[in-house]
Amino acid sequence: MSNLKDIKRKIKSVQNTQKTTRAMKLVSTAKLRKAEEAARYSRVYALKINEVLSEIAYKINQYASVMTESKFFNTTKSVEKVDIIFVTADKGLCGGFNVQTIKTVRRMIDELKAKKIKVRLRAVGKKGIEFFNFQGVELLETYVGASSSPTYEKAQKIIKDAIDDFTNGITDKVVLIHNGYKNMISQEIRVNDIVPIEPSKIVAVETNSLMEFEPEDNYTKIMDELLNKYFEYSMYYALVDSLAAEHSARMQAMDNATNNAKQRVKQLNLAYNKARQESITTELIEIISGVESMK
């Protein structure tokens, strides 16, 4: 009888877990729609920035010195120190979402150190911070709350510190890593070399959307200011893209957990029915044996 009570208690426990995971799946599904929409709008804005950069590049293409004078295009300088900004979630229960990002960061650290390049880490998200703290790895900066509730202001703060160190010559390169949204059931790691920029990435294109103008400031300053906006939005896009991917991963993880709980309940019900049948059979045998002994 005690065995039956234990099984019944397990069934109740798994059923409660199933209710929780099902509720979390529904919450993640609802949040995913909002995050997906934010990521989509961010992509549109990012494409517009690229378009404007291309137009400006066409306008100033006659000034060959612009690219070489800008501090953001100095790709000939040897790389001795790299800043890695990486984004993870503030919460768990999202499958291998955070693990994939952390693995990518660790692999890049190993590759850079093998080349005698110093690495500094700027961690966005509680899970990444906890992991590297546990490993005893020094983190230059930590940001909690930006990945779970991304805003443009938070993105500005994160990227500004890294870009300032680059322009002041403290670092030679800035890399941004996050796990991005691919579709409802999959995510992909995205590694973006923020600075220095390869000049070939900005293709000069003539369009009719900009009026002819002669700016008061020099062209290098205009390009640098526009690129700063580009850096900020690259960081913001990484945050909203990561959030959409996080909800996608959590929705999938909770769906798998719900299905596993359902299967476990079936197995426990079978075990309960079998144990109950054995118990009834044992009782019947005892009754029959008792009757026989009284004859």
Curated annotation (Swiss-Prot):
Q: Name one Pfam family in it.
A: ATP-synt
Q: What are the subcellular locations of this protein?
A: Cell inner membrane
Listed name of the protein: ATP synthase gamma chain
By sequence similarity, the record places it as follows: Belongs to the ATPase gamma chain family.
SUPFAM superfamilies under this entry? Answer: ATP synthase (F1-ATPase), gamma subunit
Q: What is its main location?
A: membrane
Q: Which HAMAP family does the protein's record reference?
A: ATP_synth_gamma_bact
Provenance organism? Campylobacter concisus (strain 13826)
Membrane topology, as annotated:
Peripheral membrane protein
Q: How does it assemble?
A: F-type ATPases have 2 components, CF(1) - the catalytic core - and CF(0) - the membrane proton channel. CF(1) has five subunits: alpha(3), beta(3), gamma(1), delta(1), epsilon(1). CF(0) has three main subunits: a, b and c.
| Matching InterPro entries | ATP_synth_F1_ATPase_gsu, ATP_synth_F1_gsu
Q: Which GO terms describe its molecular function?
A: ATP binding; proton-transporting ATP synthase activity, rotational mechanism
